[in-house]
């Protein structure tokens, strides 16, 4: 098959469905590519797991999928996983592997008040690399950090068809409600763009929401344009998870809205 007839196959990996925020930007920019999405719901949430477990589960899932669908690129659409899995993944795969990094640099450039909020998982806000990003790009800013698992759960419920509990959301963000000059918010978890409108309702003083999805989509395009492709011309976009879940039948009915044809359970334990 001529390489011009092939579409790049790109895998998005996350512990949940937060990576949809990254996937949708890629699909918007590159609508005809072949996309795979795997969420490790059996290991969710990664913010509560040890680094060794995150590395093991990510490697196992990605290797299993790559055996069936030779990948041209991989996106770790999870901030928590990106802090630990990129070196072992790059050692195991000879393809571009793109991580997700909180958009602290662009936030520091756009803020007018020099007061930034970093909203991420509990694991991410404590990582040393966050200290390094702030020291490198935002030394002249006050950077508030809020680590939350609750917002991840709220976003998961929204994507599965449930309404957002604004009372719980407002309560989780209450420590920032009185910060009138907090004008920029870094959405440091891929789940959070999925509930950006609801977050805005709770924090009306925030003018700028920064997250890396669009930049990641452009990076994928740059890395794979005009490259020799491994993947065959697969027709359908596929989704994988690692355990059955209560709303699975309802979730499957909504897959086509995101451009996927099927959901398959894979075992990685």
From Swiss-Prot:
Residues that coordinate or bind substrate: 14-15, 46-47, 79-80, 190-191
Metabolic or biological pathway, per its Swiss-Prot or TrEMBL entry: Cell wall biogenesis; peptidoglycan biosynthesis
Record-linked PROSITE patterns: ASP_GLU_RACEMASE_1 (PS00923), ASP_GLU_RACEMASE_2 (PS00924)
Domain of life: Bacteria
GO BP: cell wall organization; peptidoglycan biosynthetic process; regulation of cell shape
Annotated transmembrane regions: none
Catalysed conversion reaction: L-glutamate = D-glutamate
GO molecular function, one term: glutamate racemase activity
Alphabetized UniProt keyword annotations: Cell shape, Cell wall biogenesis/degradation, Isomerase, Peptidoglycan synthesis
UniProt-listed InterPro entries: Asp/Glu/hydantoin_racemase, Asp/Glu_race, Asp/Glu_racemase_AS_1, Asp/Glu_racemase_AS_2, Glu_race
EC number(s) from the headed UniProt entry: 5.1.1.3
Annotated catalytic residues: 78 (proton donor/acceptor), 189 (proton donor/acceptor)
Cited function: Provides the (R)-glutamate required for cell wall biosynthesis.
Database matches in HAMAP family: Glu_racemase (MF_00258)
Family classification: Belongs to the aspartate/glutamate racemases family.
Protein name: Glutamate racemase
Name of encoding gene: murI
